[in-house]
């Protein structure tokens, strides 16, 4: 398993935009993106104060690019 950095922005109904980052553990980038959609974006959109959530970056954690 690798650790994946997920960058996303949250847009609130008042127009405020907040950038966040999370780290997920997944086998590959496709699974990491799916987890981000299901575990980050979908639950946040249920909050009435949030108008949109955009995932704009998914990348492997730098220290794990090459096995030692």
Segment roles from a protein language model:
Residues 1-17:
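Short aromatic-glycine-(Arg/Gly/Cys) micro-motifs in beta-strand/loop hairpins
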Residues 4-6, 20-22, 56:
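Hydrophobic residues positioned within well-ordered beta-strands of beta-sheet architectures
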Residues 42-68:
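Short, mixed-charge low-complexity intrinsically disordered segments
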Residues 9-13, 27-29, 58, 63:
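Generic structural motif
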Residues 16-31:
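A short, exposed loop/beta-hairpin motif centered on an aromatic-Gly-Thr core
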Residues 27-48:
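A short, charged, amphipathic alpha-helix used as a generic interaction element across diverse proteins
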